[in-house]
Amino acid sequence: MPVLEHVDSLLYLGLMSGTSADGIDAALVRFAEDTHRRCELVAGTTVAWEPQLRETLVALGQGAETVAIDALGQLDAQVGLAFAAAANQLIRDSGVERRRIRAIGSHGQTIRHRPEADPAFTWQIGDASRIAEHTGITTVADFRRRDVAAGGQGAPLMPAFHLAMLGAGDQDSAVLNLGGIGNLTLIPRDGAVLGFDTGPANALLDSWCQRHHGTPFDAEGAFAASGRVDAALLQALLADPWFALPPPKSTGREQFHLDWVLQAMGSARLDAADVQATLLELTAASVADALLRLQPSTRRVLVCGGGVRNPVLLARLAARLPGVVVESSARYGLDPDYLEAMGFAWLAAELLAGRAANLPSVTGAAGPRLLGAIYPA
């Protein structure tokens, strides 16, 4: 890639690994102005986790495994080194001079998210000191815990970024991120933005596919398309009290994992493809139900995250939302594969600019807060 022409542009690098832990997304972002209301994806890459490390992270995330303090300390360092390596790879591939990148915004890897606990907590690992040390770039991390300390859920954080990039239009709209967990940003023509997790998305689909189909994800939804939705199982899954909770709410693998699915199945003997089809329908149903309940006037849903590559899921979502345009965020210049990583670059920029970046209407926090901690180069 040629040297950037806009010497007055603000370059930030965002790093993200989500609930699915399918890889580290790295995005190099140019902000056109100090207000950070417009951005351009300069370059992006996804670096796969080392398989054994991914297995450990997934098990930790769903509470299926405990780790000794020494092992957890080493895991934190390993994740930090992996994030640094992903950043360095992107910088090399992009041809951008390292000194031109003002900061890195790193989400880290969530290993536990307990906003309902007393006291509430959320925990992301990935030693930011090592990222700063191995990249030579100031790193901003630990974005969620200040919101939790202020009484919020600490999630989702992307609605503030969605609002900054898209603004309120002339009709009610929504942004749907289909990552490991689904989450919605509701942007009304007027009034406060609302954002919340909708429930499981790729995390369950990927896990079931890995166990019963031998592939890490369901390419284009083909496995789900080969099965039929089991109405009884779908009803049992949707009966989980979490779905009826009002926002603000957030969740993770601690709540929605394969043992949860197996418990709902009980003694029923179902074809693996039928379960996959049912899990896909669960994602579509939980999103559509929430949208129709909380902003029924929505006329456009922009989709991002890995689920945008699943045409079967998008078709089922559209079928449950008649009269609503369901389309990729790419239509509006926001790359669906890297939107979350771009968002964490934006969060880093907002902290360094001294601006609060949470939305209390989304997370339930007591008020606006500066998010993140700075690790100088």
Swiss-Prot record:
CDD domains named in the record: ASKHA_NBD_ANMK
Keywords: ATP-binding, Carbohydrate metabolism, Kinase, Nucleotide-binding, Transferase
Tagged with keyword Endoplasmic reticulum: no
Residues the entry annotates as binding ATP: 18-25
Chemical reaction(s) catalysed: 1,6-anhydro-N-acetyl-beta-muramate + ATP + H2O = N-acetyl-D-muramate 6-phosphate + ADP + H(+)
GO biological process, one term: 1,6-anhydro-N-acetyl-beta-muramic acid catabolic process
NCBIfam families linked to this entry: PRK09585.1-3, PRK09585.3-2
UniProt protein name: Anhydro-N-acetylmuramic acid kinase
Species assigned in the record: Xanthomonas oryzae pv. oryzae (strain KACC10331 / KXO85)
